[in-house]
Every structure is written in C-alpha cells, then in structure tokens.
Amino acid sequence: MHKDTKLLDEIKNIKSKLKSGKPAVAPKPTPKQIKAWEETHKSHLNLDTKNSSISVPPPMPDHVLLQTSKTLSVSTLPNIKFNTINQAKFLKAIEDYDLDKIKELISSNTIKIDSFGKRGKLGKTPLQYAIINDKPELAKLLIDAGANINVKTQNGRNLFELAMYNSASDQTFELLLKTNININSMDLRALSRLHNKLFSILLKPANDINTTIGKFNRTLLHQAAERNNIKKAQISINHNINVEAQDITGETALHMLKTSKMAKILLKAGSNTEAQNKLGRTPLHNAILQANKRQVNIKNIHNIVLKLIKSGANPNAVDYYGFTPLEYAIRINDSKIFKLLIKNNAKFKKNRYELFCQALESGNLTATKYLFKKEFLNNINDKNGQNYLYYIATGGNKEVLEYLVKKNHDNGKKILTQFVDKQRNTPIHIAAQNGQFEIIKNFQKLGFDINARNADGETVLHILARAQNGEMIKELIKLGADINIKNKIGKTALDKVEEDFKGISKKISNKQLQELFEESNIIARTGRIEDETKYLYQYRQDGYYKNIEREGNRGRSATLLVPEVNISLFFTGIGLLYNANDSTIRHFMPHDFWTDNARRTEDFFNMRLDNKKFVQTHSKEKFLKTYKNFLKDNPQKDYNEIIANLYPKGLIGIALQNDDLEHKLYALEAKYYVSEKYNMDLPMTIVKNKKLIP
C-alpha cells in the first residue's frame, strides 16, 4: 500500500532534533496557568531574604518565569545563584541517595531544593521522593535545609498522606510529626490506614473527627466498621465521633457490621438498631442480607443477628420493598436465622401461601415445613398464576419436592401432573429453563410427561438446545426424550442446534469452525446423538456453559443465546477456535459489550492477545480485521478507541503531550506501524513503554 510520507517526514524531523540535542520548546502558558502558579507559591514570593532559613518554592516553569519576571521584583525572590549543572547533579544525588553530595550542593546555594525532577526519573520534589521511598534521613536533611513541608501532589496528597499510602516506617512518621505540617488538610481516608498509635495521635481537636470523605460521605467510624478495625472504632468513639452519622445511602456504621465484637462496641456507644437507610433497611435487614454474599463467614453473621436481636432490634421492621427480616431469611435460604427470628416473635407481614412459595423457590426446607398447610397442595395458584410446583421447579431442591410428595400422598399423582402455566409450560419445562436436571428426573418419576409440549409446541429438548446445554440433552435422551418432535414452525431440537452453528459460521467465517459444523451436521443426520451432544458439551467447555449453570441459568438462555443476536455464540466460537483458557472467557460476558462498561471488553481483548496459544493459532492481523469488520456492523462502539487497546498491555497510553519529543516520536511510530500493518488510523497517543515496535 501507499506509505504515509507526511507521517514519515514528521518522524525523521523529530529524530533529527533529538540527535542534534535541540530541546523541545515548551508551550506558551495561559494567563490562568500563570495566576495559578503565583497563588500556589505566594508565600514564597514574599520571603524575607535576610532570613537564613529560606523555604524555596517549587521551581517556576521556564515559561511562567519569563511571563512573570516583568512583574515580580527581584528583591522578593530567594537570593540563589541558580546553576543548572549543579541542579542536575543534585537530582542525581537524590536518586543515588548520596547524602554527602546532597549536603555539598545544598550548601553551595546554587540549587532549587523543591525543584521537580525530570519526567521519567523523580517526577516529584526531592522531599516527596524521600517520603515515598521511606528515607527518613534524607527527608530530615531536606526539611532542615528548608524544603517545603506543605507541598502536595497533583491529586492533592500532602507528605503525611504519601507516607500513609506508601506504608512508611515509624521513623518517617515521627519526623513528620515534629514539623508544622498542616494536618487539617489531611485526607481522612489516608488517616484511617494508619496503625492505631499514630491514628490516635493525629486525631487532635484541630481535626473535625466527623468530617465525611469519599463519594459515599462516610466517617472514620464507617470505615472502621466496614474494615472491622475494632481499635480504630474504639479510638474514634473515645474522640466523641457521631455514632449515628449516615452516609449518602443513609447507612450508619451499624449497617456495616462484619463481626459481633464490632456490634457490641457500637451498641454500647449508643448506635440505634432501628436506623433505616434509604431503602428502609435496618442493621438487622443488612446483616441478614450479608449471609447471601460469597466469601462471608456465616457464623459471624449468625452472631451479629443474635446480638442485634438481644439488643432490641425489631424483627418485624419493614423496608421500602415491603420485606421483613424474616422474609429475607426465607429468600436467602438460611434456616438458622429463620429459626432465630421465629423464636424472637417475628411475624408474617404477607400472605402465608406467598411466603410458602418463596420458601419453595429458594429451596428452604426449614421454612417450607414451618409454613406448610395441607390446603396449599390443592393446586392453588398465586397472584402470578403459578402454583407451588412452579416454584419447586425454579428452586430445584429435591428434598423439598420429596417432602411435599409425602404430604400429598392422599391426593395421588393426578393433581401433581395437572399444572401448566399461561404458556402451557409444565413443571418440567420450567425446570429445564432453570437448568434443574435433578428435579426433571424427579418429576418424571412422579409421572410427568418428559415429551410434553408448551403453547409453541416445544418440548424440554427444544429449550435445552436453545440454551446450548449439551450435557442435559444427553441425559434426557437417555430418559426417553424424543428428538424427532417438531414445534409449531416445524423445527426439531436438532434443527435448532444447526441454526445456531450456522449463525456462528456466518459471523466468523472461519474454515476450522465450518469443518466442525459440517462434522456435527453429518453426525446429527446419521442419528449418532450421543456423539453430537458430546461435541456440544465440549463446545461449551470454554467456561461460559459452566457460568450459566452456576448462576442457575435463570432467563439467560432466552436473552443471551437468541439466534437473532448471536453475540455470545460469536465470542464463544472465538474461545473454542483460539484455545482460550477458562478464566479469559469467564471475565467476558456478552451483555457487557452493549453497556457503557467498555473497560471489561478491552480487558478481554488484551488478555486474548496476551494468550500465547491464541497467537500461535491465529495471527493478530487477521483477528483485528475480523473484529474491525464486526464493529463496522455494530456502530455502537468506536473501533479506533478499542483497537488502541488491543495491543499487549503497557504499549500505548492515553494522551500525547506535544512538548515531549521522545514520547511524540514513539506515538508517531506507533501510528505509522498500525497504518502500515492494519490499514487503520490510530488516534495520537502517548506511549507508556518505549518497547513499542515488535
């Protein structure tokens, strides 16, 4: 193709400038930039130059110095005979931790002690560098020499915060405590990270201990409760922190309990057990809902619930959704909490049959037994037109089903097998939609017809074929499911499978996938069903099939795997062809592609390109071309924006700073490389890593 000569000329021009040593010209500052610098360092510009202890301001950028030199009196500036060579030596000595050289250069009075180091080296003032790297001796030397102790980073962190975030030693903190640093400006989020001794020291009356921080407007007590830091919570309470303070969601520290010990401390300090957040939930509601989260110590949750109830928490409090703690205990299937609430006079706020159905849906056997009444088995439908069999099929707890079958033995099997919903789905259809294979087997034993059709003429096999659930298809065929039954549009379950494979083939147009499709087509036509379903199961072994199973498959088969979209099948096909590992696919769910969360999409492709097996199987060029064509058909995303993130991590960053010739050169080379290799136009970007060109 025709080379971009203009781009090549610009690259050559920059290289010649770098070779000749000609410095980059700094951009002209705006009046706003000049004013901002003057305001920041106003105190330094009015120093008494006779005072031997001079605090030198951070370096005035050259372009600012030129603009302000006409208005500033020479007598107001520090009396320093600045030497650029000595300044370079000073910064080098800081990096090398050469204390003797540093002392020598400071005494020469030819350096700016608060000067920022060159980008890529220090990137901060020498004192900030000393604090971040935990070098207390160097920090003391610089402070004694007049370094600015109130200097802040670009994101507003002072020296104390830098020490906290970088886990500095006690010596560094002790040094900072002896200075007159402004602690009032400290970020309380950083303060909460301190170990308890320093945390206690810094909570001085000058600080407003009830100051809220972060986007949720939380106090130190909120943070201590959330992290279960007992000592910090006690110290905060001893300093008269407001235990009833609410964050932006209306939650107090008591809503964030992790252990009963924290509950004891907060309750002793007067925390209100009836405080409600913006969803109307009390600390008891929140504690019970915690039990439904992964990686939670369920014993701790039980102890918290017990502690709250003993302290007077209302077990019948209703949130804005109309739920009581008892109903949440039923929904999360926690029998111990359910029994504890019943023992402490928890009442039903809803219809008993409705709660009974909730217990069935969550598979809560204890609640099912407690709520059961004989008349519930007389085929009663709830307000949604469903009866108890629907909820058993959804919940999938065979012990619950066995219990109700025993209770229903007088009525026989006829009532059990009569139920259909508005779409004429039987409990077997519903169980298949939710991936509940064991319940399907139990229903069949009770006399349900495994080949029953719904209003669309579909059997359970049609549903499983649409969900790409090959393992269940295989097992149901063994149980007698008929593969030749057609739905109302004349399609069998195997016809549905073929349609899905054709959809993938059209999207990717890859020879390997086409061969696999043809092979599966032959297998299907010859009737070797076990081989066909085995292939389907292997096809789903990329991790996505397992993910659906783990999530209960509720509703996802209908929304994510419909043939009109085929997005999930497209990316799953890529996973199969390129031998991606399970973790890569599990990090990428197709519906995220259509949301604003482009980051996960970009991360997916970064991981894909880092995958050695993928690189060995398929070239980057062909993959990028495939992806580019796909995005052209789906203009919801700007392909240039995402393509810029398709390279291995660390190559290309976010924005180009035109005053840096080296970075500009790398960015231009990147632009040229992409235009030549992929016939694409990359946005101008700054390169994080100089090893750009492969």
Curated annotation (Swiss-Prot):
It comes from the Bacteria. InterPro entries: Ankyrin_rpt, Ankyrin_rpt-contain_sf. Keywords: ANK repeat, Repeat. This is Putative ankyrin repeat protein RBE_0921. It comes from Rickettsia bellii (strain RML369-C). Gene3D superfamilies: Ankyrin repeat-containing domain. Transmembrane segments: none annotated. ANK repeats lie at residues 122-151, 155-185, 216-245, 249-275, 279-317, 321-350, 351-382, 384-413, 423-452, 456-485. SMART domains: ANK (SM00248).
